[in-house]
Amino acid sequence: MLGLVSFDATFFFQLANTLIMFLILKHFLFQPVTEFMDKRTKAIEESIAEAELKNKESNELKAQYESKLTEIKKERTQIIDEAVRNAQKRGDEIVSAAGVEARRTIEKATAEIEREKQKMMNELKGEISQLAIAAAQKVIEKDLDQSAHQQMIQQFIDKAGETQWQN
């Protein structure tokens, strides 16, 4: 068994070479790789934090936009409702003005009809009085004085006018 494991100078040189190689690799390879990995991990963590921040900001902006949109919709509804109320009010004013104008026109027409009626009655009374005078002169052969004659005609006209216009 002595031949299988021997502790001669080669063994110690190999052990020393391995140790030196380990220290050289540690200094030139493992340490830069570890630093690179740490930097990369830190960069990834910063990217994740930045992405979360951006996500949070975008959610806040989304909430603000939704709030503004809701406010705009509410304002739009108020404007439409106000426009409808104004239109309804204006329509009512137009209808009211038309009603007033129609009543005024009816009153004017009624007054005009009343004037025409009065005018026709006066003309008719004049014609009736002339007819009554002519009839009275033919019927009454006797001679009446002018005032009695006029009084009789006026009574006839009044009775004829009342009877005629009451119907």
UniProtKB/Swiss-Prot annotation:
GO CC terms for this protein? plasma membrane; proton-transporting ATP synthase complex
The keyword Zinc-finger belongs to this UniProt entry's keyword annotation: no
A single GO molecular-function term is: proton-transporting ATP synthase activity, rotational mechanism
Where is it chiefly localized? membrane
The record's Pfam families line, in alphabetical order, gives: ATP-synt_B (PF00430)
For this protein, the record's InterPro entries field holds: ATP_synth_B-like_membr_sf, ATP_synth_b/b'su_bac/chlpt, ATP_synth_F0_bsu_bac, ATP_synthase_B_chain
Q: Which residues cross the membrane?
A: 10-30
Question: Keywords for this entry?
Answer: ATP synthesis, Cell membrane, CF(0), Hydrogen ion transport, Ion transport, Membrane, Transmembrane, Transmembrane helix, Transport
Q: How does it sit in the membrane?
A: Single-pass membrane protein
Its annotated compartments are: Cell membrane
State the protein's purpose: F(1)F(0) ATP synthase produces ATP from ADP in the presence of a proton or sodium gradient. F-type ATPases consist of two structural domains, F(1) containing the extramembraneous catalytic core and F(0) containing the membrane proton channel, linked together by a central stalk and a peripheral stalk. During catalysis, ATP synthesis in the catalytic domain of F(1) is coupled via a rotary mechanism of the central stalk subunits to proton translocation.
- Subunit and partners: F-type ATPases have 2 components, F(1) - the catalytic core - and F(0) - the membrane proton channel. F(1) has five subunits: alpha(3), beta(3), gamma(1), delta(1), epsilon(1). F(0) has three main subunits: a(1), b(2) and c(10-14). The alpha and beta chains form an alternating ring which encloses part of the gamma chain. F(1) is attached to F(0) by a central stalk formed by the gamma and epsilon chains, while a peripheral stalk is formed by the delta and b chains.
Task: Name the protein family.
Answer: Belongs to the ATPase B chain family.
Q: What is this protein called?
A: ATP synthase subunit b
Gene name in the database record: atpF
